[in-house]
C-alpha cells in the first residue's frame, strides 16, 4: 500500500498533526475559537500592513500626508488602512477574550504555553503602541512622548535610556523612523512566538470546560473544529468589514486628524481603548516610578497565575465563589477602561485608585483565598 503523503511527508506531517489529525477534546466551546481567530487577525494585519508600508513614508515631514495619500489616491487604500486600524481593535478583543478563557478554565497550568502567551501579549502591545505613532497625528506624537517618557522613572539610567530610544532630545524624525522599523519587524517575531505557543500547547493538548482529563473522549480536529473555526472567521471578518466600512473612525481619536505639533499639547492625552485599563492603573499612583511598576505588573501578574492557584480543581466550572471573583475582575477591568478615558479629576481619580486596588486584590488575595475556601467546603 502506498504511504499516505499527509502522514509521511516531513513538512505536511507537521501540518497534519497540528490541524487535521490533532486529537481534540469533544466538548470545547466557542471560547476555544479565539486562538485561531488571533492567527487570522495576525495574518490580516501582516497583509494589510505590508500593502500600507508600500505607500507609507516614515519621515516627520511626510508621514501624515502619506497616510492621507493612501486614503485618497491609492486604489482601495482607504479600505486597507481602515481594515488595518480596526483590525488592531479586533486583535485585542480576541486576545482579551482568549486570556479570559484561559483564566476561567485554568489553562494557565500549562506553564510554558501560558508564559509564551504573556510574552506574546507584551509583543502585541509593543507593536500596537509603535504602530499608533506612525500616522504622526497629535495623539500619535503626544502618546509617544508620554509613554516613552515613563522610562525616565527608572533610577540612574532612566534619562539616558529615554534619549537613546528617542534618538535625540525629543520625539522626532529618528524616533518615527525606528518605530516604523520596529512596527514592521515585531509582527514576524509574534508569528514565530505563536508557533512556539502552539508547539508547547500540542505537547499537552487543549484543556476543556470541565477541567477534567479528556483523553477518553477525543475527536480529530478536522472536520469538526476546522469548520467550527471557519464559522468564527466568518463572524469576525464580517464584523471587521462592517466596522471598517461604516464607522472606521469610531474607535479612533479625533486629535489624530491634526498633524503632530510639538508646541500644542492636546487637552486629554489618552491611548487607544485597548490600553486604557493599564493607563488608568498607571495614573492612579501619584509616584512616577510606582505608576510605571503598577503598569508593568498589571500585565505581568498574569504570569503569576500558576503560583496563585490553590484549588484542587482546574476549571471554574464547578467553583461558584471563584466565578464571582472572576466576573468581578471583568467588571473592574471595564471600569478601569472607562476611567482611563476620563480626565484626571474627581471623582474619576478616586474611582481609578479604588478599581486599581481591587484589580490587584482579586489576583493576589481573592483568587487564592476562594480556591482554599472551596477546597475546605468540599472537605479536600
UniProtKB/Swiss-Prot annotation:
Annotated CDD domains: cytochrome_b_C (cd00290), Cytochrome_b_N (cd00284)
Entry keyword rRNA-binding: no
- Where does the record place it? Mitochondrion inner membrane
Per UniProt, what is one GO molecular function of this protein?
ubiquinol-cytochrome-c reductase activity
Q: Which residues cross the membrane?
A: 34-54, 78-99, 114-134, 179-199, 227-247, 289-309, 321-341, 348-368
List the membrane topology term(s).
Answer: Multi-pass membrane protein
Gene Ontology biological-process annotations: mitochondrial electron transport, ubiquinol to cytochrome c
Q: Which residues bind a ubiquinone?
A: 202
Protein residues bound to heme b b566: 98, 197
The UniProt keywords, alphabetically, are: Electron transport, Heme, Iron, Membrane, Metal-binding, Mitochondrion, Mitochondrion inner membrane, Respiratory chain, Transmembrane, Transmembrane helix, Transport, Ubiquinone
Annotated binding of heme b b562, by residue:
84, 183
Q: Which cofactor does it need?
A: heme b
* GO CC term (a single one): respiratory chain complex III
Under the heading InterPro entries, the entry gives:
Cyt_b/b6_C, Cyt_b/b6_C_sf, Cyt_b/b6_N, Cytb/b6-like_sf, Cytochrome_b, Cytochrome_b_C_euk/bac, Cytochrome_b_N_euk/bac, Di-haem_cyt_TM
Q: Note how many cofactor molecules are bound and how.
A: Binds 2 heme b groups non-covalently.
> Which Pfam families did the record assign?
Cytochrom_B_C, Cytochrome_B
Q: Which family does it belong to?
A: Belongs to the cytochrome b family.
Task: Fill in the misc note.
Answer: Heme 1 (or BL or b562) is low-potential and absorbs at about 562 nm, and heme 2 (or BH or b566) is high-potential and absorbs at about 566 nm.
Q: What does this protein do?
A: Component of the ubiquinol-cytochrome c reductase complex (complex III or cytochrome b-c1 complex) that is part of the mitochondrial respiratory chain. The b-c1 complex mediates electron transfer from ubiquinol to cytochrome c. Contributes to the generation of a proton gradient across the mitochondrial membrane that is then used for ATP synthesis.
Assembly: The cytochrome bc1 complex contains 3 respiratory subunits (MT-CYB, CYC1 and UQCRFS1), 2 core proteins (UQCRC1 and UQCRC2) and probably 6 low-molecular weight proteins.
What is this protein's name? Answer: Cytochrome b
Amino acid at each position: 500500500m502506498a504511504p499516505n503523503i499527509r502522514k509521511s511527508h516531513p513538512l505536511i506531517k507537521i501540518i497534519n498533526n497540528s490541524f487535521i489529525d490533532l486529537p481534540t477534546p469533544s466538548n470545547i466551546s466557542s471560547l476555544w475559537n479565539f486562538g485561531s481567530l488571533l492567527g487570522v487577525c495576525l495574518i490580516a494585519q501582516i497583509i494589510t500592513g505590508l500593502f500600507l508600508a508600500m505607500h507609507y513614508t516614515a519621515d516627520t515631514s511626510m508621514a501624515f500626508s502619506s497616510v492621507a495619500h493612501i486614503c485618497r489616491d491609492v486604489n482601495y487604500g482607504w479600505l486597507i488602512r481602515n481594515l488595518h486600524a480596526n483590525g488592531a481593535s479586533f486583535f485585542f478583543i480576541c486576545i482579551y477574550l482568549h486570556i479570559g478563557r484561559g483564566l476561567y478554565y485554568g489553562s494557565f497550568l500549562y506553564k510554558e504555553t501560558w508564559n509564551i502567551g504573556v510574552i506574546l501579549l507584551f509583543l502585541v502591545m509593543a507593536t500596537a503602541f509603535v504602530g499608533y505613532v506612525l500616522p504622526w497625528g497629535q495623539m500619535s506624537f503626544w502618546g509617544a512622548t508620554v509613554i516613552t517618557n515613563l522610562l525616565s522613572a527608572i533610577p540612574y539610567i532612566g534619562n539616558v535610556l529615554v534619549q537613546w530610544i528617542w534618538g535625540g532630545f525629543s520625539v522626532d524624525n529618528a524616533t518615527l523612523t525606528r518605530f516604523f522599523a520596529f512596527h514592521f519587524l515585531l509582527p514576524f517575531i509574534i508569528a514565530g512566538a505563536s508557533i512556539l505557543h502552539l508547539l508547547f500547547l500540542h505537547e499537552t493538548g487543549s484543556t476543556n470546560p470541565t477541567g477534567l482529563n479528556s483523553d477518553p473522549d477525543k475527536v480529530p480536529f478536522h472536520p469538526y473544529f476546522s469548520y467550527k473555526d471557519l464559522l468564527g472567521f466568518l463572524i469576525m471578518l464580517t464584523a471587521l468589514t462592517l466596522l471598517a466600512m461604516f464607522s472606521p473612525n469610531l474607535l479612533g481619536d479625533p486629535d489624530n486628524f491634526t498633524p503632530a505639533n510639538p508646541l500644542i499639547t492636546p487637552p486629554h492625552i489618552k491611548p487607544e481603548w485597548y490600553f486604557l485599563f493599564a493607563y488608568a492603573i498607571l495614573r492612579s499612583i501619584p509616584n512616577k516610578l510606582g505608576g510605571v511598576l503598577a503598569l508593568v505588573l498589571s500585565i505581568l501578574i498574569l504570569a503569576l497565575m500558576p503560583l496563585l492557584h490553590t484549588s484542587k480543581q482546574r476549571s471554574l466550572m464547578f467553583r461558584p465563589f471563584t466565578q464571582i471573583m472572576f466576573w468581578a475582575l471583568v467588571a473592574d477591568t471595564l471600569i478601569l477602561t472607562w476611567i482611563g478615558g476620563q480626565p484626571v479629576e474627581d471623582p474619576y481619580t478616586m474611582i481609578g485608585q479604588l478599581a486599581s486596588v481591587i484589580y490587584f486584590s482579586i489576583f493576589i488575595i481573592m483568587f487564592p483565598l476562594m480556591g482554599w475556601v472551596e477546597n475546605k467546603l468540599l472537605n479536600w
